[in-house]
């Protein structure tokens, strides 16, 4: 593979001998800025029933709805050493992955599964040995089914205690080598998808036409969001009181944030856009930065929105050392005058009072190249939420092609957008491509991949192969490849095709 990278670099030097005014390289980023790529436990590990692991709510949803599963997926559980070698070849600074709660503590509380513990120790050791920073997510859609059956999982505040005990094990066992912890992955979309819409784990809702056996879309969405914040605050407090002085790490919270723009120039749509930002951004950033929910949400949702006690408010406020952002595309916002609800009862969308429409032609799968949407998100966070440290924890586009030129163009543009935001004052400290390799996706399953590396899921050995984007990213991270303009990318596509 190194030989290919060398040839690829020589090719680029002939294809793009000049530099344009907006071309820049890795060296333009601040010292210590992390470039990486990501996966998550259920999407990458496989080995779903091996070595003591028990089902999570993600396993259960997949089997109950017959929508494919992550039983084997990439088989990262057995192939992690091979994958770390690929990370070295790609020149990653960091690798973002999650820990499976149901592998480490299969029943959600109580005894630790020693084989699961050893797997994560081995993975982290392999990363550290090869100079790759572990960036660990503690919860990624997959709490143990045992806790869901026992008391309803996140709809019950008993989850806060069990989550805190689980992360205590993680901090104790891995914290000497892990400096970056994200407690919850994309908390807003996890909550909306899992408890309002019922489309993602654990699949609870009360909307008609949905395949939900349990749930209440009017209340559970907000109860779960509240419990996630309290669980994060509890984990953060534990880390800072017990581990931070010795381990020196930081603890953050993850959100899925779109670039939101009014669909028209009307005042109503402008107001609706700000309301949508309060519901998507402020729902969690408000408590984390200021200690409470936005007034917009409190007025609209009323008694269905839980209330922080004074003590809870103080615990949540300032509990996040950084904000993790998952960002893929933009959306337009249209005001809803009469707040219709499918069920006749209020839910997240009717409460928000806005239609949010994704921008782009999604019939072609890949996402549009629109880096200004990420710039707008980072600027809004800077202006509205005291400019906290930020890591872009997911950014990428799905594609089916091996010669994924559009992904190269997308990554090039969005990384450039991050640099522009930094130059404009955003405290953004890292960028992670989603994903390092093709995975079992939350929505697309195995229909298309986001990976820098393709995975042959029909091959029992799950062969990995570098896409064009892997070579491009590797050369950029080595400082050999400067950013390409659109003309150069088209030439790259043509020349790469002719040389394949």
Swiss-Prot record:
Similarity comment: Belongs to the glycosyl hydrolase 1 family.
Name of a matching Pfam family: Glyco_hydro_1
Residues carrying covalently attached carbohydrate according to the record: 216, 361, 424, 456, 495
GO biological process: carbohydrate metabolic process
Keyword Glycoprotein found: yes
Taxon lineage: Eukaryota, Viridiplantae, Streptophyta, Embryophyta, Tracheophyta
Domain of life of the source: Eukaryota
Annotated signal sequence range: 1-20
Organism of origin: Arabidopsis thaliana (Mouse-ear cress)
Binding site for a beta-D-glucoside: 43, 140, 185-186, 328, 394, 434, 450
Record-given protein name: Putative beta-glucosidase 5
Keywords in alphabetical order: Disulfide bond, Glycoprotein, Glycosidase, Hydrolase, Signal
Catalytic residues identified in the record: 186 (proton donor), 394 (nucleophile)
Transmembrane segments: none
Disulfide bonds: 205-212
Major enzyme class: hydrolase
UniProt GO MF annotations: beta-glucosidase activity
Substrates-to-products reaction catalysed: Hydrolysis of terminal, non-reducing beta-D-glucosyl residues with release of beta-D-glucose
Gene: BGLU5
E.C. number(s) listed in UniProt: 3.2.1.21
């Amino acid at each position: 593979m190194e030989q290919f990278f060398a040839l690829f670099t020589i090719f680029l030097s002939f294809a793009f001998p000049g530099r344009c005014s907006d071309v820049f390289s890795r060296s333009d980023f601040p010292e210590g800025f992390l470039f990486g790529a990501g996966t998550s436990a259920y999407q990458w590990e496989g080995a779903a029933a091996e070595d003591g692991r028990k089902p999570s709510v993600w396993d259960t949803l997949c089997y109950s709805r017959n929508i494919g599963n992550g039983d084997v997926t990439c088989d990262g559980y057995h192939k992690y050493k091979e994958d770390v070698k690929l990370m070295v070849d790609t020149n990653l600074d960091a690798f973002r992955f999650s820990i499976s709660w149901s592998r480490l503590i299969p029943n959600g509380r109580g005894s630790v599964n020693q084989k699961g513990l050893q797997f994560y120790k081995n993975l982290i050791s392999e990363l550290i040995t090869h100079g790759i920073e572990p960036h660990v997510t503690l919860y990624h859609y997959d709490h143990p089914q045992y806790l869901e059956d026992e008391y309803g999982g996140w709809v019950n505040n008993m989850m806060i205690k069990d989550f805190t005990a689980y992360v205590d094990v993680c901090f104790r066992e891995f914290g000497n080598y892990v400096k970056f912890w994200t407690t919850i992955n994309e908390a807003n979309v996890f909550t909306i998808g899992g408890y309002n819409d019922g489309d993602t784990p654990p699949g609870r809702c009360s909307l008609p036409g949905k395949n939900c056996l349990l749930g209440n879309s009017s209340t559970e969405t907000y109860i779960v969001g509240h419990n996630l914040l309290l669980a994060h605050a509890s984990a953060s407090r534990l880390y800072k009181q017990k581990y931070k002085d010795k381990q020196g790490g930081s603890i953050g919270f993850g959100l899925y944030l779109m670039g939101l723009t009014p669909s028209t120039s009307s005042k109503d749509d402008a107001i609706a856009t700000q309301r949508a930002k309060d519901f998507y951004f402020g729902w969690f950033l408000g408590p984390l930065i200021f200690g409470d929910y936005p007034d917009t949400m409190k007025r609209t949702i009323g008694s269905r929105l839980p209330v922080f006690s004074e003590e809870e408010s103080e615990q949540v406020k300032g509990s996040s050392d950084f904000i993790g952002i998952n960002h893929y595309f933009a959306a337009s916002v249209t005001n809803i005058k009469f707040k219709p609800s499918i069920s006749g009862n209020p839910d997240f969308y009717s409460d928000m009072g806005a239609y949010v429409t994704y921008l782009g032609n999604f019939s072609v799968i890949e996402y549009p190249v629109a880096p200004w949407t990420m710039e707008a998100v980072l600027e809004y966070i800077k202006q509205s939420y005291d400019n906290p440290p930020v890591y872009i924890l997911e950014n990428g586009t799905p594609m089916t092609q091996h010669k994924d030129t559009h992904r190269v163009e997308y990554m090039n543009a969005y990384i450039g957008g991050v640099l522009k935001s930094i130059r404009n004052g955003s405290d953004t400290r890292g960028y992670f491509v989603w994903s390092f390799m093709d995975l079992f996706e939350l929505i697309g399953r195995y229909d298309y991949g986001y990976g820098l590396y393709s995975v042959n899921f029909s091959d029992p050995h799950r062969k990995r192969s570098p896409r064009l984007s892997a070579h491009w990213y590797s050369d950029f991270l080595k400082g050999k490849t400067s950013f390409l303009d659109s003309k150069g990318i088209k030439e790259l596509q043509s020349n790469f095709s002719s040389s394949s």
